[in-house]
Amino acid sequence: MHLKRALITLSLITLPIIPFSSYAVESINNTGSMESPASVAADSTSNKQDESWWQRSKHNLSATWNTSQSHDIYIPAITWHNRWTYDKEKTDKYNERPWGAGYGVSRLDQDGDWHGLYIMAFKDSFNKWEPIGGYGYEKRWRPTHDQDFQLGLGFTAGFTMRDNWNYIPIPVLLPLASISYSKLSFQATYIPGTYNNGNVFFAWFRWQI
């Protein structure tokens, strides 16, 4: 019951982020000048496109939650700090064994692409607990005759909370990639950053039950 409530909450707070992952929001003209017919037509088209993305996002979240095809167990596997962007004395102190676990629900759509809602907790670089949860999408490819073998590429949008940020919810929008066979997937993301900050590869196993 607690997991279900958590996933519902994450679905609601993640929803506003997803449309912005696929297009940039156009600036609003506040000059007060009269718009040309072409400008009005362009704004109308933009509004319809915005509504289309918004409706699609709501549909994907609703369908994933209400018509999920599997329940998933998440097992964090590795965090790796990019050695080309860190001083050695820092990486020597960081934890790269993200012990933890997670739970989620997922489905494949009519195109065979993956959608998932998840919540996971793991030990971060400072060996402190870090929860993360949200929505994930992957375009799936099946490069061989064996349809159980799949490659995925997409994004995840959601929220995380860290000890060094006083566990304030932080929105995240990150790339997502995977290699899957049957019910087992190895998924990964890369957190970009600056020198001695960010630039972390994070991966986990996902098992459909």
Curated annotation (Swiss-Prot):
GO cellular component, one term: cell outer membrane
Site positions (Role in lipopolysaccharide recognition): K90
Biological process (GO), any one: lipid A biosynthetic process
A Pfam family per the record: PagP
Keywords of this entry: Acyltransferase, Cell outer membrane, Membrane, Signal, Transferase
Location in the cell: Cell outer membrane
Gene3D superfamilies according to UniProt: 2.40.160.20
Top-level taxon of the source organism: Bacteria
Coarse class of the protein's main subcellular location: membrane
Catalytic activity: a lipid A + a 1,2-diacyl-sn-glycero-3-phosphocholine = a hepta-acyl lipid A + a 2-acyl-sn-glycero-3-phosphocholine; a lipid IVA + a 1,2-diacyl-sn-glycero-3-phosphocholine = a lipid IVB + a 2-acyl-sn-glycero-3-phosphocholine; a lipid IIA + a 1,2-diacyl-sn-glycero-3-phosphocholine = a lipid IIB + a 2-acyl-sn-glycero-3-phosphocholine
The keyword Membrane belongs to this UniProt entry's keyword annotation: yes
Signal peptide: 1-24
Active-site residues, as the UniProt record annotates them: H81, D124, S125
HAMAP family tied to this protein: PagP_transferase (MF_00837)
Function statement: Transfers a fatty acid residue from the sn-1 position of a phospholipid to the N-linked hydroxyfatty acid chain on the proximal unit of lipid A or its precursors.
Subunit comment: Homodimer.
Family to which the UniProt record says this protein belongs: Belongs to the lipid A palmitoyltransferase family.
Protein name listed in UniProt: Lipid A acyltransferase PagP
Species in which this protein is naturally found: Pectobacterium parmentieri (strain WPP163) (Pectobacterium wasabiae (strain WPP163))
Gene (name only): pagP
